UniProtKB/Swiss-Prot annotation:
HAMAP family hit by this protein: RimP
This protein's name: Ribosome maturation factor RimP
GO terms under cellular component: cytosol
Keywords: Cytoplasm, Ribosome biogenesis
Family affiliation: Belongs to the RimP family.
Role description: Required for maturation of 30S ribosomal subunits.
Regions annotated as coiled coil: none
Transmembrane segments: none
GO BP annotations, alphabetical order: ribosomal small subunit assembly; translation
Amino acid sequence: MNSAALIETITQLISPLITAQGLKLWGIELINIPQPIIKIFVDTIETNRLHENNIINSKSEQITIEQCASLSRLIGLTLEVEELFPNKWTLEVSSPGLERSFFTIQQLSNYINHDIDVTLKEQHPLWPNRKKFYGTLISITDNTFMLNLSLAHRKSDEPENVSINWQQVRKATLVHHFFQPNKKLGSTKGLNGGTT
C-alpha cells in the first residue's frame, strides 16, 4: 500500500474517533525512515470557526494535552487492531499549531490575506531556479492559488504575483506574525534597499 492509500485508509479509520471527541481532523503526515512515524493533526471546531471568519490569534480555543493523549490511545489501539504497519511504528497526535501546514487546497480558503511559505516539488515553470516562495495569499481557484510577493522576497524585476498549482506543492505552511506593539508595520527592508 503506497503512502497516499495508507493515509486515506487511516483517515477513514480515525475520523469517527476524532469527531466523537468534538474535534476535527486537520491532516495526516507519514514519515517512513527509519521506522514509520504517523503524525495526526487535529483541531478544535472553535478554532476552525474563527479561521473561517478570518479571526486568527493565539488566544482562541486550543486543543488540550489531555485530548491529544486520549485520542492517541484510541487511535493507537485502532491501528494495532488493523495491523496496517508490519513493524514497529510511532504515533504522534497534536494540534496543527499557529504555523500550520496545509494538506488540501480547500484549507487555504480560510487564510486569504495571510502570509504563506511554500516549497514546490520542482522548479516553478515560470520562475527558473525557484522552488520556494513566501508571500501573501490573495486568491484561490479549484486547483491553483496566487501569492503576492513583497520586494523582500523577490527581485525588483520579477513579477509581484505568482500562480501555483496545488499539485506542484511539496509543503505549504501558514506564517504567524506575533503582535509586537512597538514595531511599525510595513517597514520590512527590500532586497534592493526599498521598503515594503
